[in-house]
Amino acid sequence: MDKKSLYKYLLLRSTGDMHKAKSPTIMTRVTNNVYLGNYKNAMDAPSSEVKFKYVLNLTMDKYTLPNSNINIIHIPLVDDTTTDISKYFDDVTAFLSKCDQRNEPVLVHCAAGVNRSGAMILAYLMSKNKESLPMLYFLYVYHSMRDLRGAFVENPSFKRQIIEKYVIDKN
């Protein structure tokens, strides 16, 4: 088995078929200005203690937040095993990086705050990784977020796309 196949096998094996985690209900601060949440967290964003400048909506449904100055960016993504989310990784990670650098709080969400938004957060954290061991960093971030939030990037296709871009292609 070659190195890339081994990495992919080990990463998918160590993050699949785990105990069923509960869907998260709380919003999680991921970096100084990047937050991960669900649809309810987005609806509550205008009254949040965090003064969000942006909400990144990854659900299929477009909405507004009445009486709010929050900018909503909508990228409609389906949570299934055929959606190619990897084509959005570069733009989303660049946007989140700018939000962090400019101290502009952003909430990234999907319906449950697990798969679509979790995948974009994992991609963002992997894109910031300057370590020489992306496989270990992937496992560290994945398990840390799962411990913190409960269910996190349970969609095997989304995990595979992140592994291919940020782990396999880095080696």
Curated annotation (Swiss-Prot):
Molecular function via GO: phosphatase activity; protein serine/threonine phosphatase activity; protein tyrosine phosphatase activity
Source taxon at top rank: Viruses
Gene Ontology cellular component annotations, sorted alphabetically: cytoplasm; host cell cytoplasm; virion component
Keywords: Host cytoplasm, Host-virus interaction, Hydrolase, Inhibition of host innate immune response by virus, Inhibition of host interferon signaling pathway by virus, Inhibition of host STAT1 by virus, Interferon antiviral system evasion, Late protein, Protein phosphatase, Viral immunoevasion, Virion
A matching Pfam family: DSPc
Domain called Tyrosine-protein phosphatase: residue spans: 23-171
Annotated EC: 3.1.3.-, 3.1.3.48
Active site: 110
Expression triggers: Expressed in the late phase of the viral replicative cycle.
Alphabetical list of InterPro entries matching this protein: Dual-sp_phosphatase_cat-dom, Dual_spec_Phospatases, Prot-tyrosine_phosphatase-like, Tyr_Pase_AS, Tyr_Pase_cat, Tyr_Pase_dom, TYR_PHOSPHATASE_DUAL_dom
GO biological process, one term: symbiont-mediated suppression of host innate immune response
Transmembrane segments annotated in the record for this chain: none
Localization of this protein: Virion; Host cytoplasm
Catalytic activity field: O-phospho-L-tyrosyl-[protein] + H2O = L-tyrosyl-[protein] + phosphate; O-phospho-L-seryl-[protein] + H2O = L-seryl-[protein] + phosphate
Described function: Serine/tyrosine phosphatase which down-regulates cellular antiviral response by dephosphorylating activated host STAT1 and blocking interferon (IFN)-stimulated innate immune responses. Dephosphorylates the OPG144 protein.
Family: Belongs to the protein-tyrosine phosphatase family. Non-receptor class dual specificity subfamily.
Quaternary structure note: Homodimer.
Name assigned to this protein: Dual specificity protein phosphatase OPG106
Originating organism: Vaccinia virus (strain Western Reserve)
Upper lineage: Viruses, Varidnaviria, Bamfordvirae, Nucleocytoviricota, Pokkesviricetes
Gene: OPG106
